[in-house]
Amino acid sequence: TARNLITLGSPHQAVKATRLRKFVDKKYPGNFFKNINYISIGGEVEINSKETSLLTKLIARNSYKSISGNKNVSGDGLVPLSSSLLKNSQQIILPKTVHGGIFGKNWYGSSSKVREWWDLINWK
């Protein structure tokens, strides 16, 4: 039986939500199952820093705007931080972390980043 659910940069909220996302949010809002320890992890990176790829520099602002309605927010180069943090979950913010390997070198699955977020989790 699973006791913990970890999300890594998942967009939990969006201004323009798809039908499926609206359905899931309505039927199973936030941390719906009370016996599960929800952990949402979001990355924060300066878009024009050396940690990001050219792709991040080109698409981040438009991606943030399509998800949150605001292009001038922080995030992981694809998903705004506010969207990646699930309401009523244990929330972990990772500095200098991008969404995936194509967005830069330090992403949620990088060895150093996995150790970082793993050690910050309050396991139940």
Regions flagged by a language model, labelled:
Residues 1-55, 76:
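Serine-dependent carboxylesterase/thioesterase catalytic core
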Residues 34-124:
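C-terminal catalytic-base region of ester-bond hydrolases, centering on the histidine
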